[in-house]
Amino acid sequence: MNKQRGTYSEVSLAQDPKRQQRKLKGNKISISGTKQEIFQVELNLQNASSDHQGNDKTYHCKGLLPPPEKLTAEVLGIICIVLMATVLKTIVLIPCIGVLEQNNFSLNRRMQKARHCGHCPEEWITYSNSCYYIGKERRTWEERVCWPVLRRTLICFL
């Protein structure tokens, strides 16, 4: 294991910077300046390669989360995405449902207005000078084919 030694130095101004004069020995020059403090810290550094030998499950970087926290973060992220998708889907679909309901309402009003023309049988709808019957009854195929023939009408399936 290689050990390396390093020194960290920091120079900062003192809390109460007062002007002071210093006379150098042997010179007649005076130096005016602010009071400064110097901090030195000695650091012992080890080779990073020696730390990585052996146990790969240790975490040497601060940015990596241990597995339980990482798993929790992933689950919460997925839940957040699902909730956002649900909210967006709701925002988009609610106006569409409202438009469909309005269209259905206006279609029902037109059908009610069309019924009051007079020349079509009761429960029939007049549209473009023709009469139409929209049935909701359940009938067999033979009954559906014979029913319009008996009334001298044409059958149309949509």
Curated annotation (Swiss-Prot):
Cytoplasmic side: 1-74
Keyword Transmembrane: yes
Record-level GO BP terms: positive regulation of natural killer cell mediated cytotoxicity; stimulatory C-type lectin receptor signaling pathway
Transmembrane segments: 75-95
UniProt keyword list: Disulfide bond, Membrane, Receptor, Signal-anchor, Transmembrane, Transmembrane helix
Record membrane topology: Single-pass type II membrane protein
Extracellular topological intervals: 96-158
Chief localisation class: membrane
Feature: compositional bias, Polar residues: 1-12
Subcellular location, record wording: Membrane
Function text: May play a role as a receptor for the recognition of MHC class I HLA-E molecules by NK cells.
Name of this chain's protein: NKG2-F type II integral membrane protein
Gene: KLRC4
